[in-house]
Amino acid sequence: MGKICDLLDLILQKDNLNEAYKQVKRNKGKGGIDGMQVDELLPFLKENQESLIQEIREGKYKPNPVRRVEIPKETKGEFRKLGVPTVVDRVIQQEISQEISLIYEEQFSENSFGFRPRRGAHDALRQCQKNVNDGYVYVIDSIYEKGLKKMARS
């Protein structure tokens, strides 16, 4: 159980919370189901930081339901369904992500570009061009969209 406690300690460090808050603020976005907006987050965290940390440590913190939003796709009449967490839940998710990423990022494939820090579509294209220049002639393009649609969303 020691490693789990150590990870929780890292996640709940005030420096990590501050960085998570800054990232959520940079990302902007609308509020979740509770209506709290990003610009209301700092005063809330200043006032409730200790109780929030205690709730998480004691296993009593419960994330709020997400606010459902439909974003139109390029195809007419089709929509992408999103769940928008509350801004407080986004901070907590960001705290976890920051620490988990430090642990696992080095283990991911160098040829994986989706949803990775400091990587994106342009990096993937540069890698493709390098592969072509190195003599590779085949490309496999795959997407797991159908699998993702089947995942339960709560």
Where are these regions (language model features)?
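Conserved catalytic palm subdomain of right-hand nucleotidyl-transferase polymerases, strongest
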Residues: 30-37, 122-154
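Amphipathic alpha-helical blocks
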Residues: 40-65
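Conserved pre-motif C helix in the palm subdomain of viral-like polymerases
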Residues: 79-108
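Alpha-helical transmembrane segments and immediately membrane-proximal extracytoplasmic
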Residues: 71-72
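Amphipathic, well-packed alpha-helical segments that form the structural scaffold of globular domains
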Residues: 21-22, 97-101, 105, 129-133
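Non-catalytic, polymerase-adjacent accessory regions of viral genome-replication enzymes
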Residues: 1-46
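Conserved, non-catalytic sequence blocks in retroelement Pol enzymes and Pol-derived host proteins
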Residues: 61, 84-87, 115-119, 147-149
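Hydrophobic face of alpha-helices
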Residues: 34, 49, 92-93, 97, ...
